[in-house]
Each structure stands twice: as C-alpha cells, then as structure tokens.
Amino acid sequence: MSFDFDATVVGAGAVGLACGRALARRGLSVLVLESEPHIGQGVSSRNSEVIHGGLYYPTGSLKARFCVEGRRALYAFLDSHKVDHRKCGKLVVATDEAEVGRIEAIFRQATTNGVEGLEHLTGPQARALEPGLNAHAAMLSPESGVFDSHGYMLALEGEIGATGGSVVVSTPFERAEPLSGGGFRIVAGGEGGATLTSRLLVTAPGLSAQAVAARIEGYPVERIPKGHFGKGVYFRLTGKAPFERLIYPPPIAGALGTHYRKDLGGQAVFGPDLMFVESEDYSVDPAKAEVFAGYIRRFWPGLPVGALTPDYAGIRPKLHGLGEDQPDFQLHGREVHGLNGLVALFGIESPGLTSSLAIGEAVSEMLTHD
C-alpha cells in the first residue's frame, strides 16, 4: 500500500520537530502538524531555556539517559547551526547546613548519571565564583547553559524542510484510525479538514497529549496516563544581578525550584514556581513578587526591595499531582497500546527541551524497528 507520508508527527514544539528531524534523517517522508499559527508556541516557548546537565534524575530513567545524551547532542547541534547559546555553568547552592546533605545526594546522583566536570565547592569557593551569593556549600555543573530555543526550533524545521519534509501550521489534528493493511488515516485541519494517510504516527503535542491519544481509534483509554497542568511564573529583575552562572536551590517536590538565570540578552530572570491549575492560564500575579523575593534572598540577600517585575508564565505537562512522586517520561509504543507504527509521548516536561534530540532518536528507533 502507498501512503501520502512515511511518518506524520503531531506537534511542532521542540520534541515534535526533533522527532520529525530524526525520522527525516532516516530517509522517510515526514509531515509535522501544528495547531498553532507558528511552531513552538506551547510548552517549548514558555520555559527557562536552560540546557540541563542531567543532575537530578533517577538512575536508569529515561530522563537521566535522554538529558545527558540530549545535552551533548544539543550543544553540537547549536554549534553546527550557529544557534546562540552560552555554556555558563550552574551552581546548586546549599544556603545552610541543613541543605548540605541534599547537595551531596545530588552530586552522587549526577555522577551516577554520567554528568561531566562536577565539583564540590565550599562556601568561600562558591562566593569566589559568584560574589554576592549566600552559600554554605555548593556543587558546580559546568555543562549547564542557556540557549535560544526558538532559534533551535527554526533550525530543526529547516532540516526537515531540507530533506523534503513539511511542517504545516494552523492545522490541528482531529483524529486517526488504523488501516487494515497497516498505517493510519489521519484527519487534520479543523472543520472540513484534509484526510491523509501515513505509515507511521508520532504524537508529541505537549499539554494536549491525552486529548490527542483519545482521538486515535483503538488506543486503549486505560493506557492514557492522567495529565496535570503544572503552572510556573517568572519574574524579571529591574537592574542587574551579580551572577554569571545559573543559580539553583536544591529541588523541591515535583520541580527544580525557583532559580536564577541571565538570559542571552543579559536580563536576569527568576522562576518558575509550581502551582497546579485546571486549565491554561498564563497570567502572572504581581503580588507573588514578595514570595519570590523571599526565595531569592536565601541565596542572594542583596536583592533590592521592589526590584521584581512580572515576566511570563508557562505550563508543564505533568503526570503527577500535588504531593505525588514525579514519574518518568512516557513513550508509548506497540507494547503499551497494541497499535503498530504509533509512538505517543506523555509527560515531556523538564528536561524535555534539553532531551529533545535524544527523544527524537529514540522515537525514530522505536518506529523503524517496530
């Protein structure tokens, strides 16, 4: 049977585009469908734009593996495509004796995960690197950084196009049904949308992962994990902060904690926090500035009064609720849902952006060896 496309990807964020690129590099004809008017308008555009080292994630997890592999691949990609980035390094800071044990546990986990160049630092050593920092002790991850995530996604889109693939925006996925001889019939484009056939199907739509999976005929409903919206807001600093590196506290339950970064334009940004919400809401409550200031002054006592201004908010596609353990990425192949030629992605939150190239390769491997 002939198909319109070898592979169709739902979602043109960083992960969907990375999946499309990986499949196109294997010689497949690729179509990427995006419901928004532009690529990367969802989770991929409302985050910290941090390149994570791979410090925190449990041994053997997909997050641990993909973050380290993806980070190495990402730096190489950014270099080769001349996408702006800065490998500034990260300090994870213990602000008192009680947090030192948590820093040591992160160091052990990161070492097990294969993260390179880690260093234990005393308080004076940390302050020598970053004057103004309140640090009882710290660990340095020199492989962490920041980058232009939109420039990265444009480069991915360009690679897909260069191989003859297509990224089509303003074209929402409506439904799909398996064909008797293999492959899928897909309807996309809203009311009166187009119908196409594809041998392979990848769903990577971020916050709508559960809704998209439910519109694939034959996908077992009980196999679709429950999704949660984890909202995080960011505040920017009026004026300059004295730090060049990323500054992180020890992680909190379900998130990495409210951290500092200097973006590529030199702007100091703090965030995100974590609040579970029922629907997409990207407002930022200015009253949260004082709460943020309390977090920040733990590692930067010199934060000026009234210096924080609301910046933006993002929502993470979480697979856990308040007080629940944070699960791994989920890549559902045939062994989960029973449908040949389909990989559905769920819960691709942090470190999904850093991991995107590795996720793309893994998905491509799953489909071409299915």
Predicted regions mapped to residue ranges:
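N-terminal Rossmann-like FAD-binding beta1-loop-alpha1 element of flavoenzymes
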Residues: 5-32
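Active-site substrate-recognition segment that forms the wall
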Residues: 22, 51, 83-86, 194-195, ...
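C-terminal lid/capping helical subdomain adjacent to the catalytic/cofactor pocket in oxidative enzymes
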Residues: 22, 26, 326-370
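Glycine-rich FAD pyrophosphate-binding loop
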Residues: 25-46
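Dinucleotide-binding Rossmann-like beta1-alpha1 core, especially the glycine-rich loop
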Residues: 49-125, 135, 257-258
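Glycine-rich phosphate/pyrophosphate-binding beta-alpha loops
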Residues: 56, 144-146, 252-255, 343-356
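Short beta-strand to alpha-helix junction loop
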Residues: 58-69, 93-102, 140-158, 168, ...
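Helical element adjacent to the flavin cofactor pocket in flavoenzyme catalytic cores
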Residues: 139-200
